[in-house]
Regions:
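Conserved Helicase C-terminal RecA-like lobe
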Residues: 108, 113-121, 126-129, 300-324, ...
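Walker A/P-loop
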Residues: 92-112
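Conserved pre-motif I regulatory segment
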Residues: 61-98
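SF2 helicase motor core recognition
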Residues: 180-185, 233-235, 395-400, 420-424, ...
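A conserved SF2-helicase RecA2
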Residues: 462-535
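Conserved Walker A/P-loop ATP-binding site and its immediately adjacent core
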Residues: 106-108, 121-144, 232-237, 391-393
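Conserved helix-turn-beta segment of the N-terminal RecA-like "Helicase ATP-binding" lobe
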Residues: 134-157, 245-249
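Conserved P-loop NTPase motor "coupling/switch" region that bridges the ATPase
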Residues: 122-124, 151, 167-168, 194, ...
Length: 535
């Protein structure tokens, strides 16, 4: 049933053509008004009413577009894509948010929950997300977007998580694997009725984690699954995700065997391949859904530059402090040159990356799981090919092993790589290699790699020329999509380097300024930086 409707922003009401079955669906007497010989029902324009109208075959406009203040504390105005995403989320108690990386999924669903919360349609929120995103993505985004809401990150031992869960808050945030430690206690919290599953595709296999989530998710009023790449391997990847959000809906088969037969066919004893139209059919099971690419965000420029904060491990923090202290002690004469500053800066950047050159053995590997996990999550989210830049050979070797361990199809290019042209042609012109892992100095001139749309800087390079030329590999004639440049950072030295690269200044200048500040704090008095006397 489709008819003209009138929405009043002032009264928060919607007028819809009257239908007798509305009395049963609404469950209370309905006020009516006659206009131009047509009888209209006067209803509150709320998410609950919208869902009730849909049950009657009436698609009403999403209330969030009419009755929500989108303002955030940092003054960011939502993209139209984010508003459209919030419309879907607030209009359906189960929904798939399949937007690409960089389109603002996190804010979209936070705005959605806050609107429902303000309307009295949702209580508290539980976010289940990758460990590396708990603090620097979700908790920070809550602060930036809605500082009036209190968020608590449930991390640590079971006792620590339970103590954190006992704290009063509006939003609780926990990692996927941490959920099992306090799942019973979370299940008992009836005041938490909205669930966001970030990186939904982690549940694509029949694992204990997936089975537990299938049971756990059913008790929530609102459940939204977020992933930019729901089928990282095969169309059948969607089955267990759908069993969590929409079991028994959209023609989803009852078991995985039936789903596999519907989407794939067997060509020999060990190999199955997708049927024609398998991906489209898999998407019909993932409904209701919204899916936007970075190209759909018209408010963004063609090249989007973003930084991603990651916490250093305790081992990295200790080594970072040691090396910074050693450098300050080394310049006893209080003369800091560009040469010794460059050495110190390089060592600190290596610590942040987790691989440090030393005399014996050749390098030391530090605990950097958070950065590695973040990299893997970014790769899993990307819908197109990617380039990962790492500025040291030992770091490249470590990341290549990480990719191999996680079955990521990749190629490696560094100064000693043979058959470089063959690798680049395969990456650019064939489906081979999902990720190109490279030293930026080996790709900074003449190479066209427009098959990729995303570049991830695992650690910064200190040469502005190499940085710009390396980025230009995907910003060339033939590129048909917007490009995303992601910078991983964990320390002030990395932030300074990236900042200087973006504004085209010498990175050593930024580091010298940092050292000047550190020495003033540590030693006091006067000293020289590049020959300049500073009080």
């Amino acid at each position: 049933m489709t008819s003209s409707m009138v929405v009043s922003k002032a009264t928060g009401q919607i007028l819809v053509p009257y239908d007798p079955k509305l009395d049963v669906l609404i469950g209370e007497p309905i006020k009516t008004i006659r206009h131009k010989n047509q009888l209209f029902a006067i209803l509150p324009h709320t998410p609950r009413t919208q869902i009730q109208l849909r049950a009657a075959g009436i698609e009403a406009p999403a209330p969030i577009l009419w009755h929500y203040d989108w303002a955030s504390s940092d003054g960011v105005v939502p993209f139209q894509v984010q508003k459209n995403t919030a419309c879907l989320a607030t209009s359906h108690q189960r929904a798939y948010i399949l937007n690409d990386m960089g389109t603002g999924k996190t804010r979209s669903v936070l705005w959605s929950w806050r609107f429902l919360h303000n309307q009295g349609a949702a209580k508290k929120l539980l976010v289940v997300a990758p460990l590396s995103t708990l603090k620097f993505t979700w908790a920070h985004e809550v602060i930036r977007t809605m500082p009036e809401m209190k968020a608590v990150v449930l991390h640590g031992t079971k006792a620590q998580r339970l103590a954190l869960l006992a704290r009063p808050a509006d939003i609780y945030i926990i990692n996927h694997d941490g959920l099992k430690t306090i799942v019973k206690e979370l299940h008992a919290r009836k005041d938490i009725d909205c669930l966001i599953l970030d990186e939904l595709a982690v549940y694509r296999n029949r694992s204990q984690r997936s089975l537990q989530m299938q049971a756990f998710a059913q008790r929530f009023v609102w459940v939204w699954g977020l992933t930019g790449r729901p089928m990282p391997n095969e169309p059948t990847d969607v089955f267990h995700q759908c069993k969590i959000l929409t079991p028994g809906s959209n023609g989803l088969p009852k078991n995985f065997t039936h789903a596999k037969t519907a989407l794939m066919y067997q060509v020999d004893q060990y190999r199955w391949v997708p049927r024609d139209g398998a991906i489209d059919r898999a998407y019909t099971w993932m409904q209701p859904a919204v899916r936007y690419s970075l190209d759909d965000v018209v408010e963004l420029p063609e090249a989007v530059y973003r930084t991603i904060d990651i916490e250093l491990s305790e081992q990295q923090k200790t080594k970072y402090r040691e090396m910074a202290s050693e450098f300050i002690t080394m310049v006893q004469d209080k003369v800091i040159t560009a040469a010794n500053a460059a050495v110190a800066m390089g060592k600190l950047l290596q610590v942040c990356a987790g691989y440090v050159y030393v005399k014996n053995p050749q390098h030391v590997v530090l605990d950097s799981d958070s950065r590695k996990d973040t990299l893997l999550e970014l790769i899993s989210e990307a819908s197109e090919k990617l380039i990962v830049f790492a500025p040291w050979r030992h770091l490249i070797d470590g990341l290549s092993q990480l990719f191999t361990d996680n079955a990521i199809d990749h190629a490696v290019i560094h100064g000693e790589t043979s058959h470089r042209e063959k690798i680049l042609n395969a990456f650019q012109s064939t489906s081979q290699y999902r990720v190109l892992l490279a030293h930026p100095g080996c790709l900074h001139h003449g190479v066209t790699l427009t098959a990729a749309t995303t570049i991830i800087w695992y650690s910064p390079i200190c040469s502005l020329e190499i940085y710009e030329q390396a980025n230009a590999r995907i910003r060339r004639v033939g590129q048909r999509h917007k490009q995303l440049f992601l910078h991983l950072q964990s320390s002030e030295v990395e932030r300074k380097v990236y900042r200087m690269l973006r504004v085209k200044q010498r990175t050593q200048d930024a580091f010298l300024e940092m050292i000047k500040t550190s020495m003033a704090t540590t030693n006091g008095g006067t000293y020289d930086v590049e020959g300049t006397t500073t009080p």
